Amino acid sequence: MDIEDKTSKMHCMKGKHVVIICGVVIAVGLILGLGLGLGLDTKACNPPEVNGQVSTKSPISNTPDVTSPSGSSVFCSAKNDENGPWTHFRLPNYVHPVHYDLHLTPEMEAEVYTGMVNISIRLEEQTTKHLWLHLRETKITEMPQLWTSSGQVIEIKRCFGYEPQEYVVIEAEEDLRPSNYFLSMRFKGYLNGSLVGFYSTTYGENGKIKYIAATDHEPTDARKSFPCFDEPNKKATYTISITHEHDYEAISNMPVEKTISLDNKWTKTIFKKSVPMSTYLVAWAVHQFKYEERISSRGIPLRIYAQPQQINTAIYAANVTKVVFDYFENYFNMNYSLPKLDKIAIPDFGTGAMENWGLITYRETNLLYDSQESAASNKQRVAAVIAHELVHQWFGNIVTMDWWDDLWLNEGFASFFEFMGVNAKEEKWQMLDQILISDLLPVLKEDSLVSSHPITVNVSSPDEITSVFDGISYSKGASILRMLEDWISPECFRAGCEKYLKEHYFKNAKTDDFWKAMEEVSGKPVKEVMDTWTRQMGYPVLKVDLNSTVTQQRFLLDPKADPSKPSSQFSYKWNIPVKWKEGNTSNIIFYNKSELAGITITRPSDLPLNSFLKVNKDHVGFYRVNYEPQVWRALTDIMMKDHQNFNLADRAGFIDDAFALARAGLLKYADALNLTRYLQNEAEYIPWQRAVVAISYIRNMFEDDKALYPKFQRYFGSLVKPIASELKWEXDEDHIKSLLRTTVLEFACKMEDPEALGNASLLFKKWMSGISLDVNLRLLVYRFGMQNSGDEQAWNYMFQKYRTATLAQEKEKLLYGLASVKNITLLNRFLSCIKNTSLIRSQDVFTVLGYISLNSYGKTMAWDWVRLNWEYLVKRYTLNDRNLGRLISRLSGTFNTELQLWQMENFFERYPDAGAGEASRKQALETTKSNIEWLKQYRDDVATWLENSEHSNFA
């Protein structure tokens, strides 16, 4: 166990369960120390033979130390010199990079690269002897050179690294007065050991190992690739050239200007000069891929690069790219600003995708689609990520946020417009409604925690910058844009976007710049309204009384939380455009935060007495709505009689609001659970998907409750049974119906419906005998077939299928299947594979841990493995890794015992440096404490309702 004696003693003195806690911890520690810690049963994790797609990179422990590249002298060594302004986190505003000439030479098999950068710098207003710019890990190999624009050499007195702020500092012998200068630096770095900066990975092709090297620079990793002024408002132009071996090609942001054969081995590829770009958007790749090409309606070449043996899987991406690209050029009334657009699927990629200008990089699962191997959900994911990254070519690339505190200007906008982009290509996918279940409703949960943060938030370290790449910046950002568009009208919103883009073309902008554009086109007080949504965390719940009076208060999941904490300049009051509907009448009434007594909706006089006033029509507002208990009961009756009185969005919203309100103590669980009775008649994907998610919280809390969980399963199993039986375990060409089938069959299996589990096991055995499965049923069969009937033979068979699979989406499904086995020995074997990068790529480690944690047998094992191997994970990924930062909250979402809370607190005390995971740790602690209190407060209420349901005709 990874617990120090002194902290053990301190915690063992706290609670009333001290003997139980300490005894269990000691026992678990001994078991894990002998089992997991020593790598029990690792026979499945021997390095495999080379095959089509298995990585052969060495495990991290065998890689060279990137801070000490061999074979070259190192200049500008790190010094603890704090006698200068380079101790500040931000670069000075009087230094401006104008142009970079960047040359790189990667040696693919040696996994090293060398480079040289010449930077044209404009110094304004201030005289100084010092220049400093960003550099991390990569080493300077010659003394930097500095000269004036006229060519006069300026002697360098010294240079040194200042590691706390990731700077290299150059001190000149003489004063540098406001003028133009040139700075030249040579450097060397390693291509291995990381998925950020300039790195390489491998793949298999016809039994041979192949290399590809590419970049991933957002948010603060360009400084790992080359010395640069690595802040988003330090835009400059670039001329990039790459010397590479003859049998490789190089691509970058801009088209190739020319290639030069240097000798029998090396070729130099020179790219055209770029437009002004932020450093995080600079990109290049050295590869042996092929491409699928489409031409936009305006003649722009659009290419999708993939491994030669997978190039057929790039066809769908190419088709989507053309349609969505043309759509956004038309919508924004602005041409794409570069001569070409490339996309490339990287075999090992740390994030989902990266919007580099003119060269978008992707994880393979998010770009490549095979109709014979990929599910409908995979197809939608590919289309959505493509659309998201295309939006960035305008929002983010042409106009970039001035600083990372306005990250949402990039990510919130891309997350909003991606649904419009996909809808342009796939009109039958209900994408404009799916934003509810993909973004709005999920982030309502995240933003109802005290540990949330405002959309615009101060960040002052790389870790803090990384941490704001979260649901608040992406999904809440998208959701409030949806609300804004509905309020000021789609026409004004579109005109405002066009105005914003044109006024800040090739520049940086702040949130107020966007509000200004929207105000000018709409004539409405956009800033006054929207500041209450971006400059304070959280959101309101609107209480509607029987007189149609609406009042607001901050919504928090924890009933005991202080709604005034942390302090807010708006005192947690919001300016709200309230959209409502009754009968055929729909309108928007504005709720000003200063109206302390609330507002009253004037209802139509010609409606029947039993008509229903729907507040937050289409769930377009970023808030929840609570009605009087008798109104909720009336709503249940209406839904039972004819749920189609309300549209898809409203039905999904009712369910989500009801269960969130009950969890927060604002609605009785009996009323929320009564509403679910209508689901026996529901036949649409979006309401079912959200119902399953809303119900899952109770399921997670009760899963280990042997007395109560079977009752929960019987009730909800009876609700899902009709539609599961109707849809059957069959193939279907209809996209939405396929998503619905997957949702309800998965839920039926979780409720342990005998028919559903029997079908999963039957299909699993057929698959074991060599019969192919329908692509939309595979994940269900892999998971529940393995769970219900999997043994060691089946697990080994699936593991071999995983090793030989070529499509990344199929490999990911098989990983989930492997993690679903109800066998501790096999799960332990799977965990032992994590450190073998020949078997599990770096990008998939957190996926595997997450899948194992979803297994009732594996959730404790995954948590224990992470605690035992934390130092290994930190060394492999660094504390700045956003996926590592989110890992604890991902694994601990269902924790609901004092022991689990104690383990978490102890772990955080032992490893206090959270890096990019600081906010995630706070969320994990808050959620676990809330779960413990929830069981104390509501278990009996839910138990009573379930007991009564078994003696009634509810279902």
Curated annotation (Swiss-Prot):
Q: Per the record, a Pfam family? A: Peptidase_M1
CDD domains noted in UniProt: M1_APN-Q_like (cd09601)
According to the UniProt entry, what is the EC number of this protein? 3.4.11.7
**Topology class, membrane:** Single-pass type II membrane protein
Superkingdom of this entry's organism? Eukaryota
Q: Which cofactor does it need?
A: Zn(2+)
Side of membrane Cytoplasmic, spans: 1-17
| Record's GO cellular component terms | cytoplasm; extracellular space; plasma membrane
Give a yes or no for keyword Glycoprotein in this entry: yes
Task: Report residues binding substrate.
Answer: E218, G352, A353, M354, E355, N356, R882
Give its localization.
Cell membrane
Q: GO molecular function of the protein, one example?
A: metalloaminopeptidase activity
Q: Where is this site: Transition state stabilizer?
A: Y474
The record ties this protein, via SUPFAM superfamilies, to: Leukotriene A4 hydrolase N-terminal domain, Metalloproteases ('zincins'), catalytic domain
Binding residues for Zn(2+), per the UniProt record? H388, H392, E411
- Give ranges for the Extracellular compartment: 39-955
Please name the Gene3D superfamilies in this protein's record.
1.25.50.20, 2.60.40.1910, Neutral Protease Domain 2, tricorn interacting facor f3 domain
Cofactor remark from the record: Binds 1 zinc ion per subunit.
Its function, per the record, reads: Venom protein that cleaves N-terminal acidic residues from peptides with high potency in presence of calcium. It may have several roles in venom including alteration of blood pressure by cleaving circulating angiotensin-2, general degradation of host tissue, increase of permeability to other venom components, and/or processing of other toxins in the venom.
Subunit record text: Homodimer; disulfide-linked.
Q: Which family does it belong to?
A: Belongs to the peptidase M1 family.
Q: Tell me what this protein is called.
A: Glutamyl aminopeptidase
- Per the UniProt entry, what species is this protein from, by scientific name? Bitis rhinoceros (West African gaboon viper)
